[in-house]
Amino acid sequence: MIEENYHINKQKQTLFGHSYGGLFTLYVFLNHSEDFQNFVAASPSIWWNDYYILKELKEKKLDFKINTKLFLSVGEVENKNKVPSDIETFATNLRNSKNLEISILNISGASHIEALYPALNQVFKLENKR
């Protein structure tokens, strides 16, 4: 639908989601990674359904055909000093994936909602590097 009305460069696409949208972003990352080159999951609800997304990740061996970037962020307050954080656990399970660059941002003093804006800022920085 968007492609019908706007020019889309299919080699430069980013999927962004926050909270449950961040969980959706991780789902697409795991199951349809060829559709986007960049994935930004801000404060993803990894805990949902008894950490189902982590279980799904552990069952897969992911290697990427093209260079792919995954950006994960979480607010310090919402993380409740959990060590490692859910996003760090997610990233650790991907450490041996080929053609994948992972960035993690722990946002100091930020709650779940407050963590949204610094993550959006990263999307704009990512897009401006092109």
Feature names for model-found ranges:
Residues 45-62:
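Flexible "cap/lid" loop of the alpha/beta hydrolase fold
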